[in-house]
Amino acid sequence: MRTFLSLKTCLLSALLLCVNSIAASKIISVSDFGLKPDSRINAVPFIQKAIDACKQHPGSTLVFPKGRYDFWAQHAIEKDYYETNTYDVNPKILAVLLEQINDLTIDGNGSEFIMHGRMQPFTLDHCRNITLKNFSVDWEIPLTAQGIVTQSTSEYLEIEIDSHQYPYIIENKRLTFVGEGWKSSLWAIMQFDPDTHLVLPNTGDNLGWRSYDATEINPGLIRLSDPKKEADKFFPAPGTVLVLRHSTRDHAGIFIYHSMDTKLENVKLFHTCGLGILSQYSKNISFNDVHIIPNTSKKRVLSGHDDGFHFMGCSGLLKIENCSWAGLMDDPINIHGTCSRIMEVLSPTRIKCKFMQDMSEGMEWGRPDETIGFIEHKTMRTVATGKMNKFEALNKAEFIIELSVPLPAGVEAGYVIENLTCTPDAEIRNCHFGSCRARGLLVSTPGKVIIENNVFESSGSAILIAGDANAWYESGAVKDVLIRNNDFRYPCNSSIYQFCEAVISIDPEIPTPEQKYPYHRNIRIMDNTFHLFDYPILFARSVNGLTFSSNTLIRDTTYQPYHYRKEGITLEACKSVVISNNKIEGDVLGRIVTIEKMKPSDVKISKNPFFKLKK
């Protein structure tokens, strides 16, 4: 009898738990709070009320009936955030803020979220298990503009601009774009092919026309001239589409901050004020069917103002599948940490440090019990590790770290610190890296990285594995990278930007690289297809364990060779390099392998008569 009663009690308890769970989780519609689609009213205050209701029901889904929703800065929450690779413009204006919320899904049902003015559409702050899905984000007036060349002479450049989509004024002879609560002047131009929407080859960061006089010939027709002969002009052909860069990177599109288990599904960002999706000090992030691409219904070739997916100081697994990017003004993906310099040793357990890059200032660099690497910046050698006991900010640029044990012998002012706890694994599959300014995928993390089954059509290098403590201070020596079954197409590396030494560029900034202290290790490039119009295929500096094998190299003649490197593979201060069993189709140009600061015996070329080591 006791056994029967005990079983009955357990079943009743389980039933009550299930009922309570169902009662706690529910579907909540923004329409319950008076917000209707296509009403053109400010959605911000209504959504704030809906989110407050969701807090009372963990596991809820907040749904938007399909339609258009508009967001203005009025009623938006304003809060200071120090966002990496973003200028310190605070407070941030937050259209939708999720703060300390767990177990919530936001389902847009295919809705359009239209922003007005400078703002951050979504912010996730100390959240867990949040899913955002089924919506698009765009701006009524983008923070980047576009035009078409109508005339190009040795004296001037005429540009046709849709003044409804990109309102402008001429102010002090500068072409100045205006929007809701902002104005900013043209400071750079990118050139796109009007038919393919690819960045025109060998244009890249052509910084001409920074000094100019602007005049309006007719409404929507602007002439840039150079009476002082200071503009360093270039002359794109009539019909060329120009992305007219202005404004600054001051808000992310989606900011994921100190959050865990975040998912984005079926989301399109047609524009952002700065970085597209910025994940900072967050863990376990999954993006599936997420796209940062031009809004073709508005005849745009431009999309985001800067990077696409940017991950700094993250951990756990970054899983990126079935995503695409095009028309960005910076890299589609960048994964890295942040180095800081030791300015002063205050005691055996206390060091004063400084953010050396202004777009890193203000961040919380670390937390108790996290592991620190100590780096000698000239060779980029990690000489020791330690544990952090306390982080104390002195100001936006400087901070004090208290260590759990005394500083390792030999570490002194001038050394650099790296957070080794905030280093993620990454899986990037079935994605399309379309034509954007700069490179395709930047990865700097010691975690396990798999890059497979992707298509690359980047303007610069398709993949950059960097890391430095001397310029950008973006840390992360890789230890396990597999690049497999990808298709590297023209226009990969058809324009030169920083670090674009080859289609795949392994280019850490090391002032004095030494082969006995390799920075990166265990990089395998296998079973890929390269469509090559130029010589440089692979550049690698300071790698221990580099394999380039079973790839198919196909000659492409879409554009003529232009790159200053005339070798296929360039190796510097590397060891244990294997080049083998690669298939050649057509008269591929880059057959020479050059080495520097290493011996011929450090490279093994086998089953591959095509590649020849330069003596």
From Swiss-Prot:
Reply yes or no: does the keyword Kinase apply.
no
- Reaction catalysed by this enzyme: Hydrolysis of terminal, non-reducing branched (1->3)-alpha-D-galactosidic residues, producing free D-galactose; Hydrolysis of terminal, non-reducing linear (1->3)-alpha-D-galactosidic residues, producing free D-galactose; Hydrolysis of terminal, non-reducing alpha-D-galactose residues in alpha-D-galactosides, including galactose oligosaccharides, galactomannans and galactolipids
| Leader sequence segment | 1-23
Q: Where are the PbH1 repeats?
A: 282-313, 423-445, 446-467, 478-500, 520-541, 543-573
Name the EC number(s). Answer: 3.2.1.n1, 3.2.1.n2, 3.2.1.22
Q: Which Gene3D superfamilies match?
A: Single-stranded right-handed beta-helix, Pectin lyase-like (2.160.20.10)
- InterPro entries in the record: Beta-barrel_GLAA-B_II (IPR056441), Beta_helix (IPR039448), PbH1 (IPR006626), Pectin_lyas_fold (IPR012334), Pectin_lyase_fold/virulence (IPR011050)
Please name the GO terms that the record assigns under molecular function: alpha-galactosidase activity
What keywords appear on the UniProt entry?
Answer: Glycosidase, Hydrolase, Repeat, Signal
- Keyword hit for Repeat: yes
Give the top-level enzyme category.
hydrolase
SMART domains xref list: PbH1
Instruction: Say what the protein does.
Output: Alpha-galactosidase. Removes both branched alpha-1,3-linked galactose residues of blood group B antigens and linear alpha-1,3-linked galactose structures.
Question: What's this protein's family per the entry?
Answer: Belongs to the glycosyl hydrolase 110 family. B subfamily.
**Protein name, as recorded:** Alpha-1,3-galactosidase B
Species of origin: Bacteroides thetaiotaomicron (strain ATCC 29148 / DSM 2079 / JCM 5827 / CCUG 10774 / NCTC 10582 / VPI-5482 / E50)
